[in-house]
């Protein structure tokens, strides 16, 4: 692989595998509809300081991540592509960082390309590139901070060191405004032990304040602005989103300490078979400064999140770039030495996984069909699985010539699978598609009501109206609903009939209900029976006309 073609080829893969599929499927609940609506509300209201979710205060995250999604909607339109563009761009920039740091570490064009290709073909990374949430953005800022740190440490000229530390501060500041204080902590977890081990603590004391100053300069204007607009923001954000989430006895998403170990293996698909070789080589060369840095980058965040009480799978996304570098380093060396055994085993492992999945799908489809007269979706699934199987068959039997084949299978799978989901999944997990089918009628109504936050946010985003009355549902909007100007948006079951009478005096009402059991059936039964009604999966849309006065 020549220097000339590496980046254009990666760009082409980015366009085909990351950007092209962005508009092929609806918004997943709860994350995608939430982030789409919050960022859209910034555009509609002009309030870019304090995040609001369906017109209610929502202080679980800072503002910068919403800014990026809002900019995507402003540039490309308030559509699926616009909502997801920030995630795709952030992931693409992380791929570029992987290429650049690999080139700095080893100065081998093919190795740089291999590392970047492995990173962008990780199933979880490619999946996140087409998923509208804050994790791809936060991962990019963490990646940028640590790549900048390595460039600073590896530079001999004072000007280059200063620039590296300044970029580190910029990344920490933006990461902080995207997801919070972890953006400051994670680089420290790597930089401090590495600098002490290398006996370069004087350099840390000299240049560290530069990074701190830049981070403060970047984040302080917004931090002061949000405090001036919402004095309770920092109390809620610090204690609820940091202390309770990671250290509290009632921490969210509690899981055992080993939770991330199998996840790290799964996240390395389709390159799991290369892990033993990569880890063995990393251990043998652990005294090399670059390998030691990558080892700290991989292990320290993994250790921190493993010891915290609250755990979510996406917390360890910042660990994947150093993992890709270690894997790519080992894979490129195997190619140079013409040692294809590990690559062949990797292809064989993926081949077996694909065959088992295909056989399982055929069995389920014959016994209890997932797809009900959905030939188009079923064909897409079989194309995706067949692509995975063929690509890994090639690597299994021609490992040195077809070493990159699993990347093709992985990217094809992630590109096609969301568009190939059964109608039952789309109806229940992507309510914006049902709303889209009746968007004209819902947009024409005066008032909106929903008993489900995911459906409500999908409705709000599709009709471009933040004000949705929440019928017997609170969830993550508990904080916002507690404010005097928010409580009026809440409608309890014993109030809904009175609310409906008052609303229909001034205009028509659009209702989106999720009906999963008897409780929701009772909620539905309290609503008027006239008007137009549509059903799909467990969703019900009602258009209730204005009552004559």
Swiss-Prot record:
This is Undecaprenyl phosphate-alpha-4-amino-4-deoxy-L-arabinose arabinosyl transferase 2. InterPro entries: ArnT_tfrase, Glyco_trans_39/83, LipidA_mod_glycosyltrf_83. It catalyses: 4-amino-4-deoxy-alpha-L-arabinopyranosyl di-trans,octa-cis-undecaprenyl phosphate + lipid IVA = lipid IIA + di-trans,octa-cis-undecaprenyl phosphate. GO terms for cellular component: plasma membrane. GO terms for molecular function: 4-amino-4-deoxy-L-arabinose transferase activity; mannosyltransferase activity. It comes from Pseudomonas fluorescens (strain Pf0-1). It is found in: Cell inner membrane. Its main location: membrane. Its EC number is 2.4.2.43. It is a multi-pass membrane protein. The chain crosses the membrane at residues 9-29, 80-102, 112-132, 133-153, 176-196, 204-224, 259-279, 290-310, 312-332, 342-362, 377-397, 402-422. Catalyzes the transfer of the L-Ara4N moiety of the glycolipid undecaprenyl phosphate-alpha-L-Ara4N to lipid A. The modified arabinose is attached to lipid A and is required for resistance to polymyxin and cationic antimicrobial peptides. The keyword Ribonucleoprotein does not apply. The gene is arnT2.
